């Protein structure tokens, strides 16, 4: 398995892709697969055999092309058909790894529009693209998709609340207009409820948005927490009345919604992106078509059963389910035309 050189697995705080990859690595290892994880840094937090292409995480170069290309070049030097049966790539440049001597699938984690859509449209058919939601796939149906696999989360050690949370409404994301923290403030004030804005605020654009847009709106009813770690995030979710997801973009997935429901916390969200694929409105949350509906929904959502929310995640978005789905993709891609067995007698070796 190949991950970008700037991500730590599992993540110490915010990080949807990192959570997914960690859960998948551990899920595959639990099923008996030998998994090698190619990344940067020390990589000691998963069940995979870790191979680092750089001794230091490249988080200070996040989004730059050259470090990811260098990472991919080093990975390709270490991949051979004698060592691996399939490569699963999560990098942006992974879909262009056409010279690998081992079959490669690449999960697309971003929104496949604009320049990314143009790039992916030119991918060699020897590389299979996997979508993380039907919504994402519909945004670019002409791309060479081979499967759609919903992201999953490790649920084994998660604590689930037994009764609805009585704390503030929680917004948990990176500080940007797309994530709608300003809409969260307006909705909570309309409902007369306190709000916690807990989010990633590392990059210059995130800090600028917080300072210029969010901070002028703050009052005693809104608390801001920058970059909470994993333990703090879980505590916030367990205490929260609900998670609010007032997104303004066609988000391909939204891992935070799954994480919230896993703790028994329902989600109030705008009907954008993959929201209707993840939430069962009226059971695990409430989906609103317009921002004006968010306030009333925040008042109503406390009637939902935390146990139903958690059971929904265990059934539909567990790491085990994700690993099983990817097993089918691997086998179908390695042996086209063959129906992959549900429980293979011998497990292939997977390079992440």
Name these PLM-found stretches.
Residues 1-352:
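Catalytic cores of nucleotide-sugar-dependent glycosyltransferases that transfer UDP/GDP/TDP-activated
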């Amino acid at each position: 398995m190949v991950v970008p050189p700037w991500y730590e697995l599992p993540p110490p705080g915010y990080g949807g892709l990192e959570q997914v990859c960690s859960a998948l690595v551990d899920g595959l290892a639990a099923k008996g697969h030998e998994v090698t994880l190619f990344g940067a840094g020390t990589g000691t937090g998963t069940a995979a055999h870790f191979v680092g292409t750089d001794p230091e995480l490249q988080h200070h170069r996040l989004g730059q092309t050259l470090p990811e290309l260098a990472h991919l070049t080093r990975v390709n030097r270490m991949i051979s058909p004698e060592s691996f049966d399939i490569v699963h790539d999560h990098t942006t440049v992974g879909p262009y790894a056409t010279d690998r001597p081992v079959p490669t699938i690449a999960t697309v984690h971003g929104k496949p529009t604009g320049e990314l859509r143009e790039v992916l449209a030119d991918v060699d058919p020897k590389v299979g693209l996997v979508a993380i939601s039907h919504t994402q796939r519909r945004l670019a149906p002409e791309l060479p998709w081979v499967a759609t696999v919903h992201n999953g989360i490790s649920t084994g050690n998660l604590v689930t609340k037994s009764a609805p949370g009585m704390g503030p409404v929680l917004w948990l994301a990176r500080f940007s207009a797309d994530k709608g923290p300003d809409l969260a403030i307006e909705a909570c004030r309309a409902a007369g409820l306190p709000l916690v804005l807990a989010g990633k605020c590392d990059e210059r654009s995130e800090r600028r948005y917080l300072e210029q847009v969010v901070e002028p709106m703050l009052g005693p009813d809104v608390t801001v927490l920058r970059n909470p770690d994993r333990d703090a995030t879980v505590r916030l979710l367990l205490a929260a009345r609900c998670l609010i997801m007032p997104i303004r973009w066609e988000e391909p997935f939204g891992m935070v919604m799954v994480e919230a429901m896993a703790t028994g916390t329902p989600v109030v969200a705008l009907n954008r992106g993959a929201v209707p694929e993840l939430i069962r409105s009226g059971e695990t949350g409430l989906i609103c078509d317009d921002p004006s509906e968010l306030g009333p929904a925040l008042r109503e959502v406390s009637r939902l059963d935390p146990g139903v929310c958690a059971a929904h995640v265990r059934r539909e978005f567990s790491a085990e389910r994700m690993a099983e789905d990817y097993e089918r993709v691997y086998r179908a891609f390695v042996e086209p035309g063959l129906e992959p067995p549900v429980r293979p007698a011998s497990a292939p070796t997977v390079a992440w």
